[in-house]
Amino acid sequence: MVQLSSPTSFDFISAASRFATPGVTKEDAEDMYRVMQAVRAQNPKLPVTDYYLSGYSLGALDAAFVAHLDETRRSFNFKKVLLLNPPVNLYTSITNLDKLVQTEVKGINNSTTFYELVLNKLTRYFQQKGYIDLNDALLYDFQQSKQHLSNEQMAMLIGTSFRFSAAYIAFTSDQINRRGLITPPKFPITEGTSLTPFLKRALQCDFDCYLTEQVIPMWRARTDGGSLLQLIDQVSLYALKDYLH
């Protein structure tokens, strides 16, 4: 089994993406396809009976485009492709996730931040358990306890995590392409450089901001224009309607 990083992860953006601007699903799928071919080329003696492909959430959307690409490239001839909870309309999905950070949460005020609220709950949770065990089942077990997060708190947590993801993508894409939106183009960055000022600036940019400032200009420059609605159709499952049917 081979597990690929998401095209939105900083390692994939920096090492495997041709344009270092994830968000145009067809381009992301082509990058993933090249990585898959490279992995196979590095293991020429590994016997393979059949190829299967699966993806979850954004990965499911990417998997659909990779499978469609393979219909013409015929490099893998996937026997089965499993799409788990793919976003039908990518723009609608990211817009909804962007809005979660605006959720009103009871208990948050000028003296108590959301992070303090969550940390206090985690502290009480571990005190009641009597030990600290960080594992894959932590969130499920925590949500079954008396300290569980409410729907509003969970929405805020998801929204906050999503905002950080957007910031990492925006920073990495801007830095590699020298666009100067977050990091000055000629600003020297070394191992000892503090990235805090750039993180603060990147956190002001949600996914809609990243789409507007980086994805759309890059896409228009490569396709001689096009409207936002055209891009939305091209990056969502709508583009594969005939293929999926």
Spell out what each predicted region is.
Residues R74-F198:
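Alpha/beta-hydrolase-fold enzymes
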Residues F65-L69:
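Active-site signature of alpha/beta-hydrolase-fold catalytic machinery across serine-
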Residues M1-A15:
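Conserved alpha/beta-hydrolase
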Residues S5, S54, L82-N85:
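Alpha/beta-hydrolase-fold catalytic nucleophile elbow
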Residues T172-H245:
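C-terminal subdomain of alpha/beta-hydrolase-fold enzymes, centered on the catalytic histidine
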Residues T21-N43:
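Alpha/beta-hydrolase active-site loop
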Residues N43, D70-R74:
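Active-site catalytic pocket residues across diverse enzymes, especially alpha/beta-hydrolases
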Residues S54-A63:
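Gly/Ala-rich beta-loop-alpha elbow adjacent to hydrolase catalytic centers
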